[in-house]
């Protein structure tokens, strides 16, 4: 779903969270928007995606992107009765050098809002809410 579009930038929201869907969506966007920087932000919030034993299924799923971000809210782990997942474990599971991992909603929001999206596509992948992300404010970056 296209959320916003600027002169040379696009913001998309996709409900992808299964590893194969994440990989297919990232690949499709990077192929469709050649010449633009493709940035993907995946929120891990489903029961399976927050399972350390399941995380390796995401290996290479974000490799087609120019920049990849993974976010999970430790509150979601607490609610599901799961232990905190170390940032290093997430990076190792995805197998992507330079992967940005956020576990604090405010830090993620600040990072996304402060970013310059000229000549970029931002693909937000989750059926969650990124810890209460202000979509209106983020969309304004693409006007």
Residue ranges and their predicted role:
Residues 1-143:
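ATP-dependent carboxylate-amine ligase
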């Amino acid at each position: 779903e296209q959320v916003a579009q600027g002169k040379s930038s696009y913001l998309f929201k996709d409900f992808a969270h299964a590893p194969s869907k994440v990989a297919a969506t990232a690949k499709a966007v990077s192929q469709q928007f050649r010449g633009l920087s493709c940035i993907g932000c995946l929120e891990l919030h489903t029961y399976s995606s927050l399972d350390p034993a399941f995380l390796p299924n995401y290996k290479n799923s974000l490799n087609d992107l120019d920049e990849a971000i993974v976010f999970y809210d430790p509150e979601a782990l607490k609610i599901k009765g799961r232990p905190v997942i170390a940032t290093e474990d997430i990076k190792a599971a995805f197998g992507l050098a330079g992967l940005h991992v956020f576990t604090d909603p405010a830090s993620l929001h600040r990072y996304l809002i402060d970013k310059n999206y000229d000549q970029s596509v931002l693909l937000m992948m989750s059926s969650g809410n990124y810890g209460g992300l202000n979509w209106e404010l983020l969309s304004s970056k693409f006007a």
